[in-house]
Amino acid sequence: AGGDFIQPTVLINVERDADVWQKEVFGPVLSVRTFSTEQEAVLEANSTAFGLASTVMSSDPAKAMRVANRIRAGAVYATSNGEGLLAEHPAVSRGGFGCSGVGRELGIGGLHEYTELKSINYTGFTLKDAKMKRTS
């Protein structure tokens, strides 16, 4: 099959420069670090070039939402008990930031992947004056 395989693993107190902390790991691996302040947690979360998904666990809902809003990732899960971490509504777009930011899937963001946005600015006359006609 190729590639590396690792059994489901939880890595505790991962060093900041470790590959499992700085790069995306696709597989059953959870890298865990603790932080003393919100600022430290946000700085660490945003220090990587990747931003596919992050999780904030806290017993304080206001703190969890405050931190989640500051993390640069395509999906941030805020939870107090780990429930619902993968429960997403299909109307919610999925995609990452930074080096993980290759497009979006699902939701309005996914729809926009298949459209071209164009702005036309008219000055000095109204659209009624221009007698707009359908061109397609």
Where are the model-predicted features located?
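Conserved C-terminal structural/oligomerization subdomain of aldehyde/semialdehyde dehydrogenase
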Residues: 5-136
